[in-house]
Amino acid sequence: MARNTGWCIPLDKLKIREITLFAVLGAMTFAAKYAMAFLPNIEPVSLFVMLFAVAFGKKAVYPIYLYVLLELLFFGLGTWNIMYLYIWGILALAAYGCRGMENPLGWAILSGCFGLLFGAFCAPVDVAIGGVGYAVSKWISGIPFDITHCAGNFVIAFVLFRPMRQMLTKLNKQ
């Protein structure tokens, strides 16, 4: 066992393993989103956020906000970065609250509803930037994209939530 010499904190294998796992998962989330970028408003991030919340509980913040940091580093500061600071947390809390649910249809509905409400969740930042009129007009004009987001999230979660949950649960127990 490493001795604490005062200038460093020894980490056991579990801590190093968690740091590595969360780094890989955050980077994978970023890469998977951009691998699917050719499909408008269809992304796996919502699925990953739900999975991280269910598998890792409070520690889900690490891969989720690593993903947000990668967005910021690669694409610069934009309003979406501000929104991402709380939007993914909303979904993570909802998923954590539903963690006992086994039915993939339930997870698909949660993910689909999140996609449908994505524009509404963005509205507080839009109100701060341009006022209520701006936020409402932006939300309404984005409804077709939110519908696409809803459908994509629903299908992705319905097909992939159960097998990926089993995989992450297994990784978390090792």
Enumerate the language-model features and the residues they cover.
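Interfacial aromatic-anchored transmembrane helix boundaries in multi-pass membrane proteins
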Residues: 30-43, 66-101, 128-132
